[in-house]
């Protein structure tokens, strides 16, 4: 049952109708209950509903009250047995909310308790908790029933037992058997406060929104239960009638639509006004419009501003421009077979006439025609000029300000003179701005202000009067226009279905028009040809000398346009006739320079003026003549067919001389250009190539080859792409940035492995190597001894001097040239060190030695090792091996031993008790000829690039725990070399896998 919020409601099981008999006229129980309630009104109840009479009753009064209470309880229990939706009795909690009306009635819209005599009981508002006042209010509700005496009701005799739903036990009065019942107050009347959900005054505005929506939308369906919720005149006497009324209330609704709750908070989400209060499109315009929009007649020359919202597909826009011309264009989609076609587009459905959509040149197929009819003055477009078409036009062709910024003046007059749709795609002297996309998607180039080298500076005049005295050569310009499917133009648009007999326009543009445009300087004309090409959409201009053309042009004309092109467009990929199929991807490399000296050393010194003049004289076979007047300066350069394109510096000098004194002065327009031979162009843009000379830098000068190895032996099987870098790198200030070392005996690991507590690892770091402080060589080595540390310590002492000796000897053999490969040095040094360790017969050591040195402007790193101490070099996100583990289980080592004629047993993992197959010392094993060797593995020399950041050299105690990739990840997150080495050491010591000594060297190269 719906109760107004923050109000007090009363619920009593005894107030409901006794349905045991199933007859509507059986109201005896109700009358008896009402009489008992009237008698209880004389009793004194406190505010909490307890029976606390201040006056002490006498025995007779006490007995009478007990009898009355027992009689009332019997009636309550009787009603509880006959009512299937009775609220339970709770002695401790009086705040339970049991909606008996909702349980009795299956319809939630009308609150009817099937009690015709108590219609207003559910709408009772209780302002206080005074039970006496409540009982009086209940008494006033009984208008149609007469009061019956208590004696008639007491003749029933028995008190029926009730059942408490919550406590799950039977209840009854005293002396009637069963468990003891509750007090009359708890069993008969339940007072509670409802939760504030509906009916609050804060939600009253939702009803107004719903009412307004109902009035605006006649077809909208809303629930009408608000008006009939508590309608007393229409309340049925049974649930069946109640359901019928609810069905009648929803007759105007669809079957799938559910009635909206009157005061539900969902009304905000379901409200049409809330959903579309300010629903805007992507441009911020309100798209909510009235449902009916009357079309307004469109007058001549009237601009229609379209609205940025979607229009029905059936809506058409009619432009009623009636002209007397026989060649009028028709904008509708019907087949017009009349001879005299007018632009009267009749729309059958006038109610759907809405403002048109913005012009979409991609989805609209437009055929461009150039009419030769002199009487055709029709300038109708598919869409009238508006803000959307102007925006698209500006994006496609360039705004007026951009034209003025780029060309110095607008192109409107030039377009009108040439009957051309666009002059953006021009090729002047083999230079063009190619527009590969449709005009609507063309990208305009406005960055001409940054171009220093000018190729053409052309001023076009359209007057026939001339003041020129001497015959000037003409410029033949081949102007080719290619129509694509989505071609846009400022001229008239015709459908292919227009079959006008008097129409002289050729929609397929098969006719080629030759248009002569007067040209100022040297009587040069543009010969513009228009043709159809299915591949490109380009305009090409070719300049040629025509001595036979004696036509003259006018100097005085205000309608002129100049456009500037540059030879740099060829280099930037914007010039020339570039087709999609002709484009090739070019490889590029990034070269970093540390200082300007590196740039000069990379590209070489700047050429002097004498060198450039000598280069220019090779390409010239004629002289340059310069004619200077008081107002203008004209420079003309004649070149041969073999030297069509001159040096950029020569062109700049010639143009700068013309620009210094040239320009528009005294009403005269000046052309400053260099003419080139004619290029025959057909309408399919098949152009013969010119012989052009351009300065090229040899690749060998940019990427010099590395010198050959000092040792002719080929490097081991490693990918050369990761080790050889022919790029010149900037010269760093230092050889390395820093290095750090860390070592630990790892007692816990040795104890787990049951090894002697002895540190057998030795590390070596020397920078610079040798006594020379300017030496650009760094040495980093790890020696891991076995069977003692004597051999490792001895190798550490003698290795640096032996290496330095062989480095000097190798440099002397090469004539003092830098060493790019230390392979020979490593092989000789390891051989001599192993020979000097011959006294260590029963001791040995693994050795991993890394050298970092500078050769010229480059740095190199190279490693050599015997045993299982590994060196790693970072390369970006990769990790490169600089060493190779020599163990008896390695397949390559097994094959090497077999090649030496030594037989190995199947599954052999050690060589005379050693896990390694190569080591320093251990000469008693080497004398046995069982496969142990002292020859090192030498890695290829690696040119250090900015991608090589760290070098890690460590004993097998570290690599038994973590991998090289993981070690590089740990190192790269640290800031200093000391933290890098300590992080690796702690990571290895903390692992249960560590069972050996640990020695680590970390070198930062960048």
UniProtKB/Swiss-Prot annotation:
PPM-type phosphatase domain ranges (all copies): 744-1005
Annotated spans, Disordered: 1-119, 146-188, 214-269, 312-387, 459-513, 525-563, 604-642
Annotated PROSITE patterns: PPM_2
GO biological process entries: signal transduction
Acidic residues bias: start-end ranges: 59-69, 89-99
Binding site for Mn(2+) 1: 784-785
Gene Ontology molecular function, alphabetical: metal ion binding; protein serine/threonine phosphatase activity
Listed Polar residues bias regions: 1-12, 146-158, 466-481, 525-538
Cofactor note: Binds 2 magnesium or manganese ions per subunit.
Residues noted as binding Mn(2+) 2 in the record, renumbered to the chain: 784, 956, 996
Cofactor: Mg(2+); Mn(2+)
Record key words, sorted: Coiled coil, Hydrolase, Magnesium, Manganese, Metal-binding, Protein phosphatase
Reaction catalysis annotation: O-phospho-L-seryl-[protein] + H2O = L-seryl-[protein] + phosphate; O-phospho-L-threonyl-[protein] + H2O = L-threonyl-[protein] + phosphate
Coiled-coil regions, chain positions: 65-122, 450-516
Protein name in the entry: Probable protein phosphatase DDB_G0279461
Source organism of this protein record: Dictyostelium discoideum
Family label: In the C-terminal section; belongs to the PP2C family.
Keyword hit for Acetylation: no
The enzyme's E.C. designation: 3.1.3.16
Ranges of biased composition (kind: Low complexity): 77-88, 100-117, 220-234, 244-254, 316-387, 482-511, 552-561, 613-639
């Amino acid at each position: 049952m719906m109760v107004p919020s923050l109000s007090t409601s009363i619920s009593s099981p005894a107030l409901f109708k006794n349905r045991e008999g199933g007859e509507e006229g059986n109201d005896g129980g109700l009358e008896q209950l009402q009489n008992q309630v009237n008698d209880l009104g004389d009793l004194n109840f406190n505010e909490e509903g307890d029976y606390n009479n201040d006056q002490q009753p006498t025995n007779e009064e006490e007995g009478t009250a007990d009898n009355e209470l027992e009689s009332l309880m019997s009636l309550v229990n009787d009603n509880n047995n006959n009512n299937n939706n009775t609220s339970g009795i709770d002695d401790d909690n009086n705040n339970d909310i049991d909606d008996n009306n909702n349980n009795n009635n299956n319809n939630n819209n009308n609150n009817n308790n099937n009690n015709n005599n108590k219609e207003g009981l559910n709408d009772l508002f209780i302002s206080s908790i005074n039970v006496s006042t409540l009982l009086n209010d209940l008494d006033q509700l009984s208008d149609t029933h007469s009061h019956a005496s208590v004696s008639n009701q007491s003749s029933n005799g028995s008190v029926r037992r009730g059942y408490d739903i919550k406590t799950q036990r039977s209840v009854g009065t005293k002396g009637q058997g069963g468990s003891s019942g509750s007090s009359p107050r708890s069993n008969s009347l339940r007072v509670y406060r409802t939760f504030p959900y509906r009916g609050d005054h804060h939600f009253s505005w939702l009803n107004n929104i719903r009412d307004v929506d109902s009035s605006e939308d006649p077809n909208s369906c809303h629930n009408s239960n608000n008006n009939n919720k508590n309608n007393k005149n229409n309340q049925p006497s049974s649930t069946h009638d109640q359901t019928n009324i609810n069905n009648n209330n929803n007759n105007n609704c669809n079957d799938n639509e559910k009635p909206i709750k009157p005061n539900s908070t969902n009304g905000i989400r379901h409200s049409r006004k809330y959903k579309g209060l300010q629903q805007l499109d992507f441009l911020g315009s309100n798209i909510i419009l009235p449902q009916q929009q009357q079309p307004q007649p469109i007058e001549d020359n009237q601009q229609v501003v379209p609205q940025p919202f979607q229009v029905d597909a059936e809506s058409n826009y009619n432009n009623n421009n009636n002209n007397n011309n026989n060649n009028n264009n028709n904008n509708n989609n019907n087949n017009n077979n009349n001879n005299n076609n007018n632009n009267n587009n009749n729309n059958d459905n006038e109610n759907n006439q809405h403002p048109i959509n913005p012009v979409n040149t991609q989805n609209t197929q437009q055929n461009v025609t150039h009419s030769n009819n002199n009487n055709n003055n029709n300038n109708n477009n598919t869409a009238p000029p508006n803000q959307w078409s102007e925006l698209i036009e500006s994006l496609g062709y360039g705004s007026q300000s951009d034209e003025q910024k780029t060309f110095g003046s607008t192109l409107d007059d030039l377009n009108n003179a040439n009957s051309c749709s666009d002059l953006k795609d021009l090729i002047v002297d083999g230079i063009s701005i190619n527009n590969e996309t449709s005009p609507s998607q063309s990208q305009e180039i406005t960055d001409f202000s940054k171009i220093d080298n000018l190729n053409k500076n052309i001023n076009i005049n359209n007057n026939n009067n001339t003041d020129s005295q001497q015959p000037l050569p003409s410029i033949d310009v081949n102007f080719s226009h290619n129509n694509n499917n989505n071609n846009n133009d400022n001229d008239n648009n015709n459908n292919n279905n227009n079959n006008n007999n008097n129409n002289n326009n050729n929609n397929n543009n098969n006719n080629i028009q030759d248009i002569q445009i007067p040209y100022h300087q040297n009587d040069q004309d543009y010969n513009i040809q228009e043709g159809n090409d299915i591949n490109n959409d380009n305009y090409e201009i070719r300049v040629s000398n025509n001595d036979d053309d004696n036509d003259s042009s006018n100097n005085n004309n205000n309608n002129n346009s100049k456009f500037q092109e540059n030879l740099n467009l060829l280099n930037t990929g914007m010039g020339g006739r570039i087709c999609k199929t002709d484009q090739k991807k070019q490889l590029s490399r990034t070269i970093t320079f540390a200082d300007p000296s590196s740039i000069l050393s990379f590209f070489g010194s700047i050429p002097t003026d004498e060198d450039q003049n000598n280069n220019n004289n090779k390409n010239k076979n004629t002289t340059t003549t310069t004619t200077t007047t008081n107002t203008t300066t004209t420079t003309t350069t004649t070149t041969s067919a073999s030297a069509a394109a001159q040096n950029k510096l020569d062109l700049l000098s010639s143009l700068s001389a013309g620009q210094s004194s040239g320009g528009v002065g005294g009403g005269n327009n000046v052309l400053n250009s260099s003419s080139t031979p004619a290029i025959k162009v057909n309408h399919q843009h098949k152009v013969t190539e010119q012989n052009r000379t351009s300065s090229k830098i040899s690749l060998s000068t940019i990427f010099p080859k590395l010198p050959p190895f000092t040792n002719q032996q080929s490097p081991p099987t490693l990918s050369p792409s990761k080790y050889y870098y022919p790029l010149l790198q900037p010269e760093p200030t230092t050889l390395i940035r820093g290095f750090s070392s860390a070592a630990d005996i790892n007692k816990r690991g040795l104890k787990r492995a049951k090894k002697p507590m002895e540190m057998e690892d030795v590390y070596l770091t020397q920078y610079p190597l040798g006594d020379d402080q300017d030496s650009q060589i760094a040495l980093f080595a790890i020696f891991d001894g076995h069977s003692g540390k004597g051999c490792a310590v001895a190798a550490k002492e003698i290795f640096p001097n032996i290496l330095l000796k062989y480095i000097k000897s190798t440099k002397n053999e090469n004539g003092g040239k830098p060493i790019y490969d230390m392979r020979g040095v490593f092989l000789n040094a390891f051989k001599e060190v192993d020979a000097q360790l011959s006294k260590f017969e029963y001791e040995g050591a693994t050795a991993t030695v890394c050298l970092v040195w500078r050769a010229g402007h480059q740095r190199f790193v190279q490693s050599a090792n015997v045993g299982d101490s590994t060196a790693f070099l970072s390369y970006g996100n990769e990790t490169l091996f600089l060493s190779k583990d020599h163990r008896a289980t390695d397949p390559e080592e097994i094959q090497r031993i077999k090649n030496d004629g030594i037989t190995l047993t199947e599954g052999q993992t050690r060589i005379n008790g050693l896990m390694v197959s190569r080591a320093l010392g251990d000469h008693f094993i080497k004398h046995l000829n069982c496969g142990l060797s002292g020859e090192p593995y030498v890695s290829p020399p690696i040119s250090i690039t900015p991608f090589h950041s760290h070098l890690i050299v460590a004993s097998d105690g570290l690599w038994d725990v973590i991998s090289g990739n993981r070690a590089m990840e740990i190192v790269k997150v640290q800031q200093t070399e000391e933290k890098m080495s300590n992080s690796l050491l702690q990571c290895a010591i903390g692992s249960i896998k560590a069972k050996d000594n640990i020695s680590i060297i970390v070198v930062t190269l960048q």
